Structures are given as structure tokens and as C-alpha cells.
């Protein structure tokens, strides 16, 4: 039954314009039901966002795929994720690159995500409890940065931690949000608007 629902989801993603086969294989390899509450497991393969507690959500599979595809990852890409959340996006990234760094401001979510990733034998992830606005400077610079919550403006620290040629993908805005694609070229930042989106806000600071 799960396999059938997964195949339906993959078909929907292809119909929505996701064509990177390596990415689709990574999505197929990650059991989304493991990243949501048991009571919501029957909705795991619906193309919708779901609550994960602490006022946070696991993103819609299309948005996970769209943002990941925009990063143009190779196996050796150095990747930073801001907002570990449930760990689902992290797991997709871990199937695509050699190592992932991920920052989560809510300690309980970080701990749960770390446990889930370990249970799935995904050991190529470093998680950190901290303020996502600050990135993870000691692990940078990064070839790709993905942000899974929306700041009102692009955090300077994330721009600074982007390597030459690197790509930053994030939602930006408050009441109205758009997905931004940022590439650093010749020490300049080229910003494109991709589409309208709706994410939880990227809050400064960290919670125990």
C-alpha cells in the first residue's frame, strides 16, 4: 500500500515538473511516514504539508523536491540546511550528497530528527542546535544552502557563508512570501524570484 502511494506521489511530482531522476530516487528511498506523527501516517504520501509539533511543519513533497532541484547538487556538494524540522528534507539531501550540515533552533525537534536519521542508517549528517539566522560559519563555506522557513529578508550570514558559484534557496517574506534563488558569482549575489510560497517564519534565536 505504501509503495503504491509512493508511486502516485512520484507521478504527481513528475507532472508538476520535477524531472531529476536522482532526486526522485532519493525521495522514493525516504519513508515519509517515519517523519510524521503516527496519527498522520496515512497522509504521509499526500502532496501536502503536515504539522510536526512546536508550531512547525514538514514541507509539501513538491516544495521539498522543487527547492532541492534548484540547488543543482552533486555528490561532493557542501550543503547547509537551515531548519532541520522533522529531518525529512535532511534525509533527502543525505541521499544526494556525501555530507549534510543542518541547524535547528528547537532542541526537541533537533533531537527527534537526529534519532530518525540514525534509525534510517543515515550517518552522513551533522546536526546542530542553534540560530538558523547565523548559519554554521565554522563548517562553511557551502556550495548549497537551503532554508525551510521564511525570514523577512535574506540573512547576511547565509550570504557570507555561500561559496563562489554557490546557490542559496529560501522563502522570503512575512504575510506574502516568494521563493528566492540566489547565486554568488564574482562576489556578487544574483537573486531571482521563483514562485509564491507559504512557509512558517524563520525565528531568530534558539529554544531549549
Swiss-Prot record:
Q: Where in the cell is it found?
A: Cytoplasm
| PROSITE patterns attached to this UniProt entry | PCMT
Ordered alphabetically, the record's keywords are: Cytoplasm, Methyltransferase, S-adenosyl-L-methionine, Transferase
**Catalyzed reactions:** [protein]-L-isoaspartate + S-adenosyl-L-methionine = [protein]-L-isoaspartate alpha-methyl ester + S-adenosyl-L-homocysteine
Q: Which family does it belong to?
A: Belongs to the methyltransferase superfamily. L-isoaspartyl/D-aspartyl protein methyltransferase family.
**EC number(s) on file:** 2.1.1.77
One GO term (biological process): protein modification process
Q: Name one GO cellular component term.
A: cytoplasm
Identify this protein by name: Protein-L-isoaspartate O-methyltransferase
Which CDD domains does the UniProt entry name for this protein? AdoMet_MTases
* Source organism of the structure: Yersinia pestis
| Reported function | Catalyzes the methyl esterification of L-isoaspartyl residues in peptides and proteins that result from spontaneous decomposition of normal L-aspartyl and L-asparaginyl residues. It plays a role in the repair and/or degradation of damaged proteins.
Name the principal localization, coarsely classed: cytoplasm
Catalytic site = 59
* Presence of the UniProt keyword Cell wall biogenesis/degradation in the record: no
GO molecular function annotation:
protein-L-isoaspartate (D-aspartate) O-methyltransferase activity
A Pfam family annotated for this chain is PCMT
Amino acid at each position: 500500500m505504501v509503495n503504491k502511494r509512493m508511486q502516485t506521489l512520484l507521478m504527481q511530482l513528475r507532472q508538476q515538473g520535477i524531472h531529476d531522476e536522482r532526486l526522485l530516487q532519493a525521495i522514493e528511498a525516504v519513508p515519509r511516514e517515519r517523519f510524521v506523527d503516527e496519527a498522520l501516517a496515512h497522509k504521509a504520501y499526500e502532496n501536502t504539508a503536515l504539522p510536526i509539533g512546536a508550531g512547525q511543519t514538514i514541507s509539501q513533497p513538491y516544495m521539498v523536491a522543487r527547492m532541492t532541484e534548484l540547488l543543482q547538487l552533486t555528490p561532493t556538494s557542501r550543503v547547509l540546511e537551515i531548519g532541520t524540522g522533522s529531518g525529512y528534507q535532511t534525509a533527502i539531501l543525505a541521499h544526494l550528497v556525501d555530507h549534510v550540515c543542518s541547524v535547528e533552533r528547537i532542541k526537541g525537534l533537533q533531537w527527534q530528527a537526529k534519532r530518525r536519521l540514525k534509525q534510517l542508517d543515515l550517518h552522513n549528517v551533522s546536526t546542530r542546535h542553534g540560530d538558523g539566522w547565523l548559519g554554521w560559519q565554522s563548517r562553511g563555506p557551502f556550495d548549497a544552502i537551503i532554508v525551510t522557513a521564511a525570514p523577512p529578508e535574506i540573512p547576511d550570514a547565509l550570504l557570507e557563508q555561500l561559496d563562489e558559484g554557490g546557490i542559496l534557496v529560501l522563502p522570503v517574506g512575512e504575510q506574502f512570501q516568494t521563493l528566492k534563488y540566489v547565486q554568488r558569482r564574482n562576489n556578487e549575489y544574483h537573486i531571482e524570484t521563483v514562485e509564491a510560497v507559504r512557509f512558517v517564519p524563520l525565528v531568530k534565536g534558539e529554544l531549549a
